[in-house]
Amino acid sequence: MSASAPEPPRLDLSFVRRGGRTVIDRRLFAWPFVLTRSFHTDGARPDLLSVILQTGSGAVHGEDRLTQRFTLREGAAVSVTTQGATSVHRAEPGARAVEQVQLRVAAGASLDYRPEPRILFPDAALCQVLELDCAADAVALVTDAFTMHDPDGQGRLFRELDSTVIVRRPSQEPLLIDRMQLCDPGTALFKGRRAFGSAVLMLPDMHDRAAIRLRVIDTLAHIDDLYAAASLLPQSVGIGIRLAARELRQLRAGFDAVAALVREIDLGARAAQAPSAAATARPTAA
């Protein structure tokens, strides 16, 4: 699949900051995507809008072509998750499902994008491309994960997983192109682990990213049965994280721990910039 010629978005959301809060100013979606209410529930970040993305099908099928686009305008703050882990079902020989996600994070915006993992069933084939276009003074945490499941308990695996992550600054060439391709993998390849994930963390230049990388490593080291690594991205623009575990719960714990650390860092930076601007808000629906 060419990242330069994606399918038209079946989900297209744009977010803006108005009156001290983030709201949706473009809301377009088609089958299988479903979007209901979004919420302001964070007392420490009353501007943060939480979005729970749902799908009518609850799964990705063999020849699906799904493109999503999320655009955060200047100063917007958004948290995106999904209703639950998404099953990726068998694809006919020669076919594969294709999914593209475009994330655009403008100056001063912050994005916490943590969809639930993919569950790859026997003979599943999935090609996914995630593009993160992030301004230099924006904050973004973007995660991706998968696990494997054979309902018959015979240890059968998926057929193909082709995953690409592209990170760039606005209107610039990519800073990072990270690709993983697994075709007809054998059980021995995974060394007893069945849940795998990665994350990209982008922070403004005011932060010491090398020091934060060490904090990420220390945070993840406290989670039992989780193999984790973190490294600086090219030009030290951010941090790349890899996770492997025997079960999804350990992977989720890792992502949650990183998100909590990012939240702590971001709130601290905001308090330092505007110590008198502390505000609270009652949870409301948007």
UniProtKB/Swiss-Prot annotation:
GO terms for molecular function: nickel cation binding. The keyword ATP-binding does not apply. It is found in: Cytoplasm. It comes from the Bacteria. InterPro entries: UreD. It holds the Pfam family UreD. Disulfide bonds: none annotated. The keyword rRNA processing does not apply. GO terms for cellular component: cytoplasm. Required for maturation of urease via the functional incorporation of the urease nickel metallocenter. Belongs to the UreD family. UreD, UreF and UreG form a complex that acts as a GTP-hydrolysis-dependent molecular chaperone, activating the urease apoprotein by helping to assemble the nickel containing metallocenter of UreC. The UreE protein probably delivers the nickel. This is Urease accessory protein UreD 2. The gene is ureD2.
